[in-house]
Amino acid sequence: YNAEKTHLLGAYTSQTNPDGKSFATEFVAGDDIILEYEPPVSDEKARIAINQIGYGYNHLHVTTDLRSTGPGTSGSCMVNINCEEGEEWQNEKNGVCMMVEKIGKVGYLCSGSLVNNTAKDMKPYILSAFHCTQDYDNGKIASETDLNQWVFYFHFEHTGCENTSPVAGHKTMTGCRRIVSIPIEGGSDGLLLLLNDKIPAEYNVYFNGWDRSETATSSGVNIHHPSGDYMKISTFGNHPIKTTTWLDNLSRTGAPNAHWNVIFDKTTNGHSITEGGSSGSPLFNENKQIVGTLTGGNSTCRLTSGNNLYGKFSYHWDKYSQADTGRMDIWLDPLNTGATTIPGLSQTGEEGSLINYKSPTNVTAQSISSNNVLIQWNAPVYTQLISSVSGSTQ
């Protein structure tokens, strides 16, 4: 806790860190922190070693209460997840997390998402981007000790649309192990992690569904944490999504046609794009299934028409390697069903819909007598076959 005792973390017990290995906490507000240890009844001496202290500044949001201290540090064009743009994505947002990472002596920020699997057993897999495990300066890969100290933030969001609206009470998980790594060079920049512990039921998270087909979606969103800011949503649909090959200024070339290129739309409350910290975040199709993970791009609030490249989930699936650590199919389809798509799953076991339901249009109401109103509408048009007709009722 901090010196003012206004920000408290814990208590941490053997249940929090059952293996007694490396562990980390989320950030504490303030310049002074106090670590309090309560020994067991026995005379056993404590074995505690503080390996490193990370000092966050400028871009890290740590407040001593549940209210934001001001606008976020991401670009001014960003749209908060609880604006109207996110109304139809309230389940999916509960699976998206901010990742605070330790790689050697350096800290990084990325985004990721819980993902469902065909066993529907709520195994806490996190889907993200491989480059999130690399030190940008020297390419060093996060070690097992590093991964045990990664912290995953869920529900890190404003409760309203404005940056001045209250902040939700976030939940964190600490530690993971690497399951699948697919690099940028010659690959699709995919990463599958498994959290060290099962997520408590009261966390109210969501295991997002996926679509491993090669079909380019006509519309969708990206939910992410740009610059480590509170959760944002970026929307696309006015510009066709295109297949492309990754090539960056470090001369790294991805596998041919292993990325989606997305240009985001201006919406009611802004023109969200992506930034550093958005890396690894999920790209959702119109049916609310993950089809990609962010590698990077050149879009900014000044260049909203810039490119945003996502490693294809279809490539992550089984196209990079036959090794268990280079493909996601054996982990996310453990029953070997051959499923192409799968819906999301809540912690209560409720599955998401594979249909993105739309509102009727041209709704009119006409009073035809003192006790009757004629309501008419046009039903929405779907790309999937469902029961839907135009009509009227009294």
Language model segments and positions:
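Pro/Thr/Ser/Gly-rich low-complexity, intrinsically disordered linker/stalk tracts
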Residues: 350-383
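Extracellular low-complexity, O-glycosylation-prone stalks/linkers
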Residues: 379-394
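Short, surface-exposed beta-strand/strand-loop-strand elements in extracellular ectodomains
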Residues: 1-5
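Serine endopeptidase catalytic core focused on the charge-relay Asp
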Residues: 27-264, 276
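C-terminal subregion of chymotrypsin/trypsin-like serine protease catalytic domains
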Residues: 126, 141-146, 162-175, 180-183, ...
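Catalytic nucleophile loop of clan PA
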Residues: 113-124, 271-294
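Beta-sandwich interaction modules
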Residues: 6-32, 38-43
